[in-house]
Design a protein with these regions (language model features):
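Beta1-alpha1 glycine-rich phosphate/pyrophosphate-binding loop at the start
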Residues: 2-67, 144-175
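Alpha-helical segments flanking ligand/cofactor-binding loops in enzyme cores
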Residues: 19, 125, 182-183
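A Rossmann-like FAD-binding core segment of flavoenzymes
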Residues: 68-82, 89, 155-214
């Protein structure tokens, strides 16, 4: 009799393990989303509708033998995972692969692909009507998003606010890399506000076209 492996989380790690064990174990993947999200392409999906369609991979096509339970894991104990008030899954092995969370649009917290797609479309349409956009954080994600925005919307004025005194302040980045990125940002007329922590969050949600001042 095959061992049952319950994997909690359907991100990169959880999906990789589930597919590798699918032929040799009774695999149950517990994940609230209806599709795997290729998060590395999320920022390109903000500006490109074709990429928006490519970042989602339905879980119902993931496993040949195992199954996917679209729900949250409510509790975990040795040999048992509770996913709802009336459903428990017995397990020989439990793997926690819950991953990390980042603000939209770097990652998506919504469980339904249709909801995320609508939000991406709304953001893209809002960007096309905007004159200026504010990005908070000059780390790798903020800088990548700045590059995507300035490439897709040349008319858009981009300002990056960063509380540290330089870009890419967290991490062992070479000074030459920082200088090269600063040059690219300047060539795209991106305004850097360094050493300037944001006093308060804007009064609108991320990706909503609405004038504000901070």
């Amino acid at each position: 009799m095959q061992q049952r492996v319950v994997i909690i989380g359907g991100g990169y790690g959880g999906v990789a393990l589930a597919t590798q064990l699918d032929d040799v174990a009774d695999v149950v993947l517990v994940e609230p989303k209806d599709a795997f999200v290729h998060a590395a392409a999320a920022l390109r999906a903000v500006v490109d509708p074709e990429w928006q369609e490519r970042v989602f991979f339905p879980y119902d096509q993931l496993l040949h033998r195992g199954r996917v339970v679209q729900d949250w894991a409510r509790s975990v104990s040795p040999g048992l995972v509770r996913v709802s008030a009336d459903e428990e899954i017995e397990a020989d092995h439990v793997v926690l692969a819950t991953g990390t969370a980042y603000p939209f649009p770097a990652k998506f917290l919504e469980d339904e692909t249709a909801v995320v797609s609508a939000r991406l479309t709304r953001m893209r349409e809002g960007l096309s009507r905007s004159e200026r956009v504010l990005l908070v954080g000059a780390g790798p994600v903020g800088l990548e998003l700045a590059g995507e925005l300035t490439s897709a919307f040349p008319h858009l004025g981009v300002t990056i606010v960063e509380q540290e005194d330089d870009i890419l302040a967290q991490g062992d980045y070479l000074p030459e890399l920082r200088e090269a990125v600063r040059t690219q940002l300047a060539d795209r007329d991106v305004v850097l506000e360094l050493g300037a922590p944001l006093g308060y969050l804007p009064p609108v949600d991320v990706g909503i076209h609405f004038p504000f001042t901070v």
